[in-house]
């Protein structure tokens, strides 16, 4: 997994078959914010085109795409394959750095946070889980970066 060399604005993505959750962070604060969802396109090319518009509109320099790694080593899921193909489609459209980041249990954690911490009903959680999962993915990635000490 490579570390970004000069990323300034980040887009976190939680890919799903129905919805794609989005989160945003930019230097110098790197405060991660959920920015909503987009509907997954009928195919990966349409989803990549919709994401590319967001990349351009927010001047994104680094995309952190949640990679749904299996809980057991050696297994490979169809969703993991779709994420890899989505990354390839994005690379065809944009020169931004695309990083596949371990997102195991991010949606489960987001769902739990919305239910237990926020007390939201299943109906109220719908649509919020994906962008919160994207926020958790992006925050996890940013937390892994070396901290810059400024005095």
UniProtKB/Swiss-Prot annotation:
GO terms for molecular function: nuclease activity. Its EC number is 3.1.-.-. Disulfide bonds: none annotated. Its main location: cytoplasm. GO terms for cellular component: cytosol. SUPFAM superfamilies: Ribonuclease H-like. One of its GO terms (biological process) is rRNA 5'-end processing. PANTHER family: POLYNUCLEOTIDYL TRANSFERASE, RIBONUCLEASE H-LIKE SUPERFAMILY PROTEIN. NCBIfam families: RNAse_H_YqgF. This is Putative pre-16S rRNA nuclease. It comes from Chlamydia pneumoniae. The lineage of its organism: Bacteria, Pseudomonadati, Chlamydiota, Chlamydiia, Chlamydiales.
């Amino acid at each position: 997994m490579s570390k970004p060399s000069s990323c300034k604005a980040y887009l976190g993505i939680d890919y799903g078959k129905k919805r794609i959750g989005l989160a945003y962070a930019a230097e110098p604060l790197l405060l991660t914010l959920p920015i909503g969802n987009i509907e997954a396109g009928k195919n990966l090319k349409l989803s990549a085109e919709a994401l590319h518009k967001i990349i351009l509109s927010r001047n994104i320099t680094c995309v952190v795409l949640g990679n749904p790694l299996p809980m057991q080593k050696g297994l490979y899921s169809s969703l993991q394959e779709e994420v890899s193909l989505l990354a390839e489609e994005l690379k065809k459209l944009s020169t931004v750095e695309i990083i596949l980041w371990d997102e195991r249990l991010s949606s489960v954690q987001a769902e739990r946070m919305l239910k237990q911490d926020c007390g939201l009903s299943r109906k109220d959680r719908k649509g919020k889980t994906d962008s919160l999962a994207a926020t958790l993915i992006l925050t996890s990635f940013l937390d892994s970066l070396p901290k810059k000490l400024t005095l």
